Amino acid sequence: GSAMLFNIRLPQNFNSPFKANSLINFWQRWHMTLTSFLTNYIFNPSVKALKEVTFVKMMLIIIMVFIICGFWHGPSWMYGFFGLLHGLGLVVNHIFNKLFNFKLPKIFSWFLTFTYVNLTFIFFRTQNFDNAILVISKMFGLNKIGEGVFLTKEFYILIALIIVCFIINSLFKNSYELFSKYLYFKGNN
């Protein structure tokens, strides 16, 4: 970007997060500088401070870190709740990985991740819980405004667009992947 005009190298902050096929993978790709900061200065010291490290304690620390991550964005319960939802989602992801020795089909795991992330972003962007519930209820047709939305031509066009976006997102490289092959960009992770 424009920082390169002044020979300033900024760390990569996003790496196609909507290509993620798990919530763990999403946070490895999304807001990478914040995730790194939280890992280095909150998660790791919290784990090191434990006398006995257990899976349950580590999962509780993950939840705590993501609540802090939420409040890092602003002093609002909505941000804290967003962090709680992501912390709980990560815990479920870790428990699933620990208990089951198989992976879901890529498209299914991508769809679950994409849906979960976007539903939780509603809590991040709305002013209060009532507004968040209203948005969600309108999305799923749980009120008079959304009645019959699943039978309209627009609904099927939307589904087609989502499928096209998934294909583009999955098959094509992002700008960093495209331009990193040029010598000027090498080593600028």
Locate each region found by the language model.
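Membrane-embedded transmembrane alpha-helical bundles that form the catalytic cores
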Residues: 1-165, 169-189
